Amino acid sequence: MKPFWKTKNFQIRWKEPLGKPDCPYAFRYVLILFGYSIRIHVWIRSDDKRYLHDHAWNFRTFVLKGHYFNVSQNNDIIVREKVSFTAFRKADHRHYVEVPKQGCITLLFCSRPYRKWGFWVDGKQFKRPLKYFHKFGHPICSEQ
C-alpha cells in the first residue's frame, strides 16, 4: 500500500490492512519521522501463528484497549505472556501475537530500523516476508 503522505524524512500510512485483503488480521496507522515511527495497530484477530517472526526495530508497545498474548519460545518451551499494559521488545525477539475475540488496540514507539525482519521456519531458517508468503501462502482466515 502506498503511503498517504511521504517525503524524505516524513511519512504517513493510514489504515493499512495487514494480512489477506479479504480478511486482514489488523489495521495499521503509521507516522514515520526521520526513521523513527509511531504506530497504532487495531487488532481484529491473531497474526500468523505457523512460525515466529521478528522485527526490523526495537519497540515499546502500550495496550490502549483490551489485551493480547505474546507467544514466544524459550529453548523448546512455548511461552505465552499476557500483555495488558506495556512491553518492550528487541528487534530480534521472535514471537507471534495472539488476540482474543474482542480484539485489541496497541500504540507502538519504534526505533529506526537496523536489520531485516522475517519469519523463522522451524526456528532455524530465516525467510523474508515475501519469500515466506510465496512459499507458505497466507493462513486461512478462520485459522488466525
Language model regions located:
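A short, N-terminal "cap"/entry segment at the start of jelly-roll beta-barrel domains
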Residues: 1-37, 77
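Short acidic-glycine-tyrosine-enriched beta hairpin
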Residues: 71-96
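Internal intein/HINT superfamily modules and their associated LAGLIDADG
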Residues: 20, 86-87, 124-129
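Short, conserved beta-strand element in jelly-roll/cupin
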Residues: 54-69
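Active-site or metal-binding loop neighborhoods of secreted/extracellular toxin and effector enzymes
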Residues: 117-144
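Ligand-binding loop in jelly-roll beta-barrel domains
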Residues: 90-116
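A short secondary-structure junction signal
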Residues: 41, 72-74, 98-99, 116-122
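Conserved short histidine dyad/triad with adjacent acidic residue
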Residues: 37-54, 90-92
